[in-house]
Curated annotation (Swiss-Prot), chains A, B:
The keyword Lyase applies. PANTHER family: PTERIN-4-ALPHA-CARBINOLAMINE DEHYDRATASE. GO terms for biological process: tetrahydrobiopterin biosynthetic process. The keyword Disulfide bond does not apply. CDD domains: PCD_DCoH_subfamily_b. Its EC number is 4.2.1.96. This is Putative pterin-4-alpha-carbinolamine dehydratase.
Length: 95, 95
């Protein structure tokens, strides 16, 4: 079992990942991205897919034309863990 | 404005696209796919993305690890059109 984030780690999220917000009905973080068109959105998704495989941690995500929504949570933790923070930081590094 | 499917065309969907079902709260069709892992799921998504660009018609879709859900509807028709059928048939051709 992977440990969930502590209260102190959660409090630090606002500064650490200012573009991400806590999901409403899940112990998860999410971020929405908008691009010029589908081609740019899917190019970004491809880079995120490579990151996900590298981290062995995968997003729950959706795409509608130029928009991409990414939700991160850790199944083996039953909620947010350090793995989500690391992947979110890596994704932010692309954007 | 693109014409929506007629009643006769809708009645034919069961035979034409047996793997697809009507969405519950949208005038749309959807299909769920399951793969061995994320890598296979995303490889499939990449092929669907190429089809979407070729057809100039894009899915609303989501992915969680090995699962992919695709919903097709035509914004410019306010619901299902022949474009959705053509793209669904092309996607079935990959699977």
């Amino acid at each position: 079992m992977i440990p969930r984030l502590t209260d102190a780690e959660r409090a630090a999220l606002v500064d650490l990942l200012p573009e991400w917000s806590l999901a409403k009905d899940r112990d998860a973080i999410e971020r929405r991205f908008a691009f010029a068109d589908f081609s740019e959105a899917f190019a970004f998704m491809t880079r995120v897919a490579l990151l996900a495989e590298k981290h062995d941690h995968h997003p729950e995500w959706s795409n509608v034309y130029n928009r991409v929504t990414i939700l991160l949570s850790t199944h083996d933790a039953g909620g947010l863990s350090a793995r989500d923070i690391r992947l979110a930081e890596a994704i932010d590094g692309l954007a």
